[in-house]
Amino acid sequence: MQHETLLHIQGIDKSFPGVKALSNACLSVYAGRAMALMGENGAGKSTLMKVLTGIYSKDAGTIEYLGKQVTFKGPKESQEAGISIIHQELNLVGNLTIAENIFLGREFVTPWGSIDWKKMHQEADKLLKRLGVSHSSHQLCSELSIGEQQMVEIAKALSFESKVIIMDEPTDALTDTETAALFKVIRELKAEKRGIVYISHRIKEIFEICDDVTVLRDGEFIGEKAVNVLDEDQLIEMMVGRRLDEQYPHLDKPRGELLLEVENLSGSGVHDVSFTLHRGEILGVSGLMGAGRTELMKVLYGALPRSSGKVRLAQQEIHNTCPQDGLNHGIVYISEDRKGDGLILGMSVKENMSLTALAYFSKSIQIDHKAEQLAVGDFITMFNIKTPSQEQQIGLLSGGNQQKVAIAKGLMTRPNVLILDEPTRGVDVGAKKEIYQLINEFKKEGLSIILVSSEMPEVLGMSDRILVMHEGRISAEFQRGEATQEKLLAAAIGKSAL
């Protein structure tokens, strides 16, 4: 069956100083169908979307939209033509209401020239209802969770009534309920003959909601296939050029002596938690969203206040009242929100990586920049970070490379305990494998690791021992050999282990 082509991108080339980002990149979007755009981090997906919407100019190639060749001069022009993009990074104004954010710059006006607040809120409420969001459009965006803010971004894109809607990692911060609501809307959009470009690293979502898939690798077009003729292994092989038969390369190594003891720890969202951690051990922490996993790590690290309990490191009791205390005691926390808490996107790779370790490069009151540069260079090589130079602005790197820099930044302080909170969120399958291999290297060197993850296969595949949290408490503990997804899920919802 032939489908109407809304958008056809052909033979796009784009180079930056020292880097060829796109080479003969292609993409077609069809009416009433969702096209997945897949590829590892750094494959060129975001660059191609920026060329399409006019943020970057192309070096070669053509863009046809609704049968006409076009070159957009910027996002405003492409949006007015009927191409909307939902960015992975939130772009909301916190002290404005939901309605004000949705219609910012496009406010409804009365015949008398004033803003028609009533109509604006009515239209915003309709969009929120369509997405299953229960909040009033009068609520400030600063009062919303990250997932709820993402739904506002989606509502904003829907308000344009676009022919083509590009969704860049739209479910990254969404709950299962919010994701189901989004998928319902995508199906409605397809029924209205809109075209969807769906960019995601969550392969299961591709098979659930998309009709076709286009794969880029190293900036080049690899192929376009109907989703129903592929399986997961074939799609992964297209993306990375090899099969990933062993996604979780667990290192079987005896753990060392007891390093960390947490006894009856309570604090913000955490109640009476006790556990231990040994040298060279990977301790997985599983649980549903809101179970208190991140809060526990932040209380342990000193980013959230502790109300009671004891923490002993190498048999010495410690009191982390702020993150600097955690760092001083050799505990490093790599946040789940690398862009909000972990990295400064406007600074360079070098500046980000060495920021918390400048004391190691200090000579009296001066920084030994040569030593800093050498150390950063070593980590770039060790972590296989793809960057033109140490001076590259980190916000221009792919998500996987940003995550590697965030982890390297923590390791520069030479910690005893490394807490990784959702270390592979928003990271493609190839970069995930590299991060898992790095984790095994850290383990081999005797580093103690706490791995917090929402992905049960990741926790099961990488951990030596697993804690499950429910409502701020430890609901179960499993040794590697006895844990299953069914047992983890049962403990996560508060049931007895199966």
UniProtKB/Swiss-Prot annotation:
Annotated keywords: ATP-binding, Cell inner membrane, Cell membrane, Membrane, Nucleotide-binding, Repeat, Sugar transport, Translocase, Transport
Record EC number: 7.5.2.7
Domain (ABC transporter) ranges: 7-243, 254-496
One Gene Ontology term of the molecular function aspect: ATP hydrolysis activity
Superkingdom of this protein's organism: Bacteria
InterPro entries tied to this protein: AAA+_ATPase (IPR003593), ABC_carbohydrate_import_ATPase (IPR050107), ABC_transporter-like_ATP-bd (IPR003439), ABC_transporter-like_CS (IPR017871), P-loop_NTPase (IPR027417)
UniProt cross-references to PROSITE patterns, sorted A to Z: ABC_TRANSPORTER_1 (PS00211), ABC_TRANSPORTER_2 (PS50893), RBSA (PS51254)
Main localization of the protein described in the UniProt heading: membrane
Subcellular location: Cell inner membrane
Annotated binding of ATP, by residue: G39, E40, N41, G42, A43, G44, K45, S46
Catalytic activity: D-ribose(out) + ATP + H2O = D-ribose(in) + ADP + phosphate + H(+)
Pfam families registered for this protein in UniProt: ABC_tran
GO cellular component term of the entry, any: plasma membrane
Homology family: Belongs to the ABC transporter superfamily. Ribose importer (TC 3.A.1.2.1) family.
Summary of subunit composition and partner proteins: The complex is composed of an ATP-binding protein (RbsA), two transmembrane proteins (RbsC) and a solute-binding protein (RbsB).
Function according to Swiss-Prot or TrEMBL: Part of the ABC transporter complex RbsABC involved in ribose import. Responsible for energy coupling to the transport system.
Protein name: Ribose import ATP-binding protein RbsA 1
